[in-house]
């Protein structure tokens, strides 16, 4: 693995892996991930992907082993707090939050238990895979507690008599409900994030990082945007433009055979709901099309 190539650590398996790979492919990177390979070379860019455990990524960045990493903010902050407590290097630079991997680290208790606030957790034994984040929250609240550290199946700890409550990642809450638990307190909100090691980069690597960031911005913005086309009566054009969400001035073009209407094209950065489309139609708009955008660059 050449030091001249940009080294990016990503999760080998798990909730962030697939979406991370898809993002890089949308950015124009060609690669083939197969079998148990730990290093994958991009076919069209001087980039190497390191496929590792998610909890190894922060340390690889903080120790300067790789240049960039994609990691959930929950895992990143847990490792940062742990290394800081041990006096180990914990510096990194956040380049941007990404548009996937959303979750929250929450304390959950028995579904029948009354909860009035964090003070109700005093003296409880809490099972978690994230002891540093849990400790940070509880210390901030000034609440004494004890920790039961588990590496998986945290939600079964109360039923097994290992703990009174848990602190675990929550997306929908279905797993908690299936185990007779309810969410009581959100400790930390997380999304996937792109991070960079500390230190200088040579001109080629710096330019490649900037290129990736620009393409990521374009991919994420395109995913959140829609291209809207419609025919609008000329006498209702201003009212129709006022209805269109999150839009800059649209492109307005004459129609070849209908002088009473114009074609309106625009990029919307907000969702166009059915109600808005019905209002547009009520104003006389027709041929309303809402299309996804694959890529965009401003």
From Swiss-Prot:
Its EC number is 2.4.2.17. Transmembrane segments: none annotated. GO terms for cellular component: cytoplasm. Gene3D superfamilies: 3.30.70.120, Periplasmic binding protein-like II. Feedback inhibited by histidine. Signal peptide: none annotated. GO terms for molecular function: ATP binding; ATP phosphoribosyltransferase activity; magnesium ion binding. Belongs to the ATP phosphoribosyltransferase family. Long subfamily. This is ATP phosphoribosyltransferase. GO terms for biological process: L-histidine biosynthetic process. It catalyses: 1-(5-phospho-beta-D-ribosyl)-ATP + diphosphate = 5-phospho-alpha-D-ribose 1-diphosphate + ATP. It comes from Aliivibrio fischeri (strain ATCC 700601 / ES114) (Vibrio fischeri). The keyword Ribonucleoprotein does not apply. InterPro entries: ATP-PRT_HisG_long (IPR020621), ATP_PRibTrfase_cat (IPR013820), ATP_PRibTrfase_CS (IPR018198), ATP_PRibTrfase_HisG (IPR001348), HisG_C (IPR013115), N-reg_PII-like_a/b (IPR011322), N-reg_PII/ATP_PRibTrfase_C (IPR015867). Pathway: Amino-acid biosynthesis; L-histidine biosynthesis; L-histidine from 5-phospho-alpha-D-ribose 1-diphosphate: step 1/9. Its cofactor is Mg(2+). Keywords: Amino-acid biosynthesis, ATP-binding, Cytoplasm, Glycosyltransferase, Histidine biosynthesis, Magnesium, Metal-binding, Nucleotide-binding, Transferase. Its main location: cytoplasm.
